[in-house]
Design a protein with these regions (language model features):
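Short beta-strand/loop motif that positions the catalytic acidic residue
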Residues: 214, 220-222, 226
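Catalytic histidine-centered segment of alpha/beta-hydrolase-like enzymes
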Residues: 228, 255-268
Length: 279
């Protein structure tokens, strides 16, 4: 599904959202999935397709300047949240649930804080606050992106020899993620979106204030073996949810940072329970 949006300078561009193989239906509740740094909509394929065939609209976006979306790649969480609002407006969506992974979780959080009652559920997958990125990794993403990509994919996995459970026998989640990173990086010849995304994560400072402003239930999905955003790094957000009297739940899965592909069924089941889906 392509949506026509405008840049800050007033220029139009096409933004892409994967719909799970089902036509968008304004009557159905809408789920918006937001990817992380150097990813695209495809990281959610195992959750979005199921949910699209079980009563939901699915909009798994490519952030601007990533994958199939044009426009300027966002340089901050706040800028990316403006895209989410514009995308909802363009699609004619009055209310939606937001599900974000890693950098996408911060974008979802900031968007939920800004959009208030327009957001009905907020799921933060592989989240942390602050989401600091090591200086070495930021430097490598700028000057040696292939080296940085290998580093990220090593630290993002619970094991490099995981059982082929994601897409069936023969799946190599590490190799697939490396290929995805190369493809997304090559999709933007104007800007190093690897570096820009990491800087956006590292510089975001509004997490606690944003969480306090959220008006909907919150789900945290955390990887027990996550080395990029370990469960302890989400403690400040969870504590803020408790202190602020939010309705929230925490689900831990026995995998690393890419919960959607390393533990797809567990991640889907957590989302189904959160969304009160019984099927």
């Amino acid at each position: 599904m392509n949506l026509t949006l405008k840049t800050a300078a007033g220029q139009t561009y096409e933004a892409y959202a994967y719909t799970g193989g089902k036509a968008f239906d304004a009557i159905k509740p809408t789920l918006v999935f937001i990817h992380g740094v150097l990813n695209d909509h495809s990281v959610w394929i195992l959750q979005t397709r199921y949910l699209a065939h079980h009563g939901f609209n699915v909009l798994a976006v490519d952030l601007p300047g990533h994958g199939r979306s044009g426009g300027d790649a966002p340089s901050s969480v706040e800028e990316a949240s403006q895209f989410i609002e514009a995308m909802l407006d363009a699609a004619g969506v009055r209310q939606a649930s937001l599900i974000g992974h890693s950098w996408g979780s911060l974008i979802a959080l900031e968007s939920a804080a800004r959009l208030k009652e327009r957001i009905t559920h907020l799921a933060l997958v592989g989240t942390a606050f602050p989401m600091k990125v090591s200086p070495a990794l930021i430097e490598s993403s700028l000057n040696e992106p292939m080296k940085a990509l290998k580093m990220v994919n090593v630290f993002s996995r619970a094991t490099l020899a995981a059982p082929p459970s994601a897409l069936g026998p023969g799946t190599w989640v590490y190799g697939a993620s490396m290929a995805l990173g190369r493809r997304v990086l090559a999709s933007n010849s104007q800007v190093n979106i690897f570096y820009r995304g990491f800087v956006a994560c590292d510089s975001y400072a509004n997490g606690l204030e944003a969480l306090a402003a959220v008006t909907c239930p919150i789900l945290f999905v955390l990887g027990e073996s996550d080395q990029m955003t370990p469960p302890r790094a989400a403690k400040s957000l969870i504590d803020q949810a408790k202190t602020s009297g939010k309705t929230y739940s925490v689900v831990k899965v026995a995998m690393g940072h890419h919960q959607m592909t390393e533990s797809p069924e567990e991640t889907l089941n957590a989302l189904k329970a959160f969304l009160n889906l019984q099927a």
